[in-house]
Curated annotation (Swiss-Prot):
Changing R89G: In SBHX; mild. The gene is DCX. The keyword Ubl conjugation applies. The modification Phosphotyrosine is found at Y70. This is Neuronal migration protein doublecortin. It is found in: Cytoplasm; Cell projection, Neuron projection. One of its GO terms (biological process) is central nervous system development.
Length: 365
């Protein structure tokens, strides 16, 4: 006798499907649209995480470097330190990045990048060795259409227009730029450091660029040079102020400048730096010495040629000429000072020198 249990199997399948669908009030995850949407969202997030971001990196303070394009992704760089190490191998040099890449800034220096998630597609960043951003027109030598991002290409039009306007303004203002040597004195307690900076059409492109060069030369303890003042207390606000009547400027950092009279007065060392090389001022003082010796040197020759008024003068001339011809005769009066002849010779030894001094004084007068 055979028993048919097929209807029991179909009933069990139906009950299992109903229990699975009614557990959360939603269809089964295997056959629901919610599961397909979840899978799509997960794949999209994974693709976005693995998608490389195209960014450009510059060297801090290098206005002639066109930058290097990097494809930054989590597959290529496992951590932010790995990105810094790879940038060090690509960008490190002894001038702008002597200690490698340790910091990454935005192109305007307003923000410091701390992770790869903060990097945005199509943007530009500046790599630095120290915690100091140098404000330079980095995008001046770069084609603005390098990025495929539409938003970035639209934003890059503004710096291009600013660069064109700045170049036009520079062409208009080239008349007042002339070769000039200015003295920059560091503000603070004396003795203060002073440097001389040459300004011309090749070194003075903009006011910000001159401030950057002065910062590198003067090396303030507080960092960046923010303000410059003349000795009259007038603040320098534009490039045209460097080419006025003032040649000496006081460099100040972010700290509040103290308007004290002593800050605008120069001491002896600072005045020497203004005048130039200190050895140049000491040169004329040393020149009269050889002239005085040259005036003394022809003295004995002139006295030997001129006739003497007394016999003592003739003896004096005779002894002096013999002493000049034979240097051993100088030791004879000194060896026997007690003899009368030695006293006479010793007396005559100093006579021409005193006469020559009087003659030289008379000639100088």
């Amino acid at each position: 006798m055979e028993l048919d249990f097929g209807h029991f199997d179909e009933r069990d399948k139906t009950s299992r499907n109903m229990r699975g669908s009614r557990m959360n009030g939603l269809p089964s995850p295997t056959h629901s649209a919610h599961c397909s949407f979840y899978r799509t969202r997960t794949l999209q997030a994974l693709s976005n995480e693995k998608k490389a971001k195209k960014v450009r990196f510059y060297r801090n303070g290098d206005r002639y470097f066109k930058g290097i394009v990097y494809a930054v992704s989590s597959d290529r760089f496992r951590s932010f330190d790995a990105l810094l190490a790879d940038l060090t191998r690509s960008l490190s040099d002894n001038i702008n990045l002597p200690q490698g890449v340790r910091y990454i800034y935005t192109i305007d220096g307003s923000r410091k990048i701390g992770s790869m998630d903060e990097l945005e597609e199509g943007e530009s960043y500046v790599c630095s060795s120290d915690n100091f951003f140098k404000k330079v027109e980095y995008t001046k030598n770069v084609n603005p259409n390098w990025s495929v991002n539409v938003k970035t290409s639209a934003n890059m039009k503004a710096p291009q227009s600013l660069a064109s306007s700045n170049s036009a303004q520079a062409r208009e203002n080239k008349d007042f730029v002339r070769p000039k040597l200015v003295t920059i004195i560091r503000s603070g307690v004396k003795p203060r450091k002073a440097v001389r900076v040459l300004l011309n059409k090749k070194t003075a492109h903009s006011f910000e660029q001159v401030l950057t060069d002065i910062t590198e030369a003067i090396k303030l303890e507080t960092g960046v040079v923010k303000k410059l003042y003349t000795l009259d207390g007038k603040q320098v606000t534009c490039l045209h102020d460097f080419f006025g009547d003032d040649d000496v400027f006081i460099a100040c950092g972010p700290e509040k400048f103290r308007y004290a009279q002593d800050d605008f007065s120069l001491d002896e060392n600072e005045c020497r730096v203004m005048k130039g090389n200190p050895s140049a001022t000491a040169g004329p003082k040393a020149s009269p010495t050889p002239q005085k010796t040259s005036a003394k040197s022809p003295g004995p020759m002139r006295r030997s040629k001129s006739p003497a008024d007394s016999g003592n003068d003739q003896d004096a001339n005779g002894t002096s000429s013999s002493q000049l011809s034979t240097p051993k005769s100088k030791q004879s009066p000194i060896s026997t000072p007690t003899s009368p002849g030695s006293l006479r010779k010793h007396k005559d030894l100093y006579l021409p020198l005193s006469l020559d001094d009087s003659d030289s004084l008379g000639d100088s007068m």
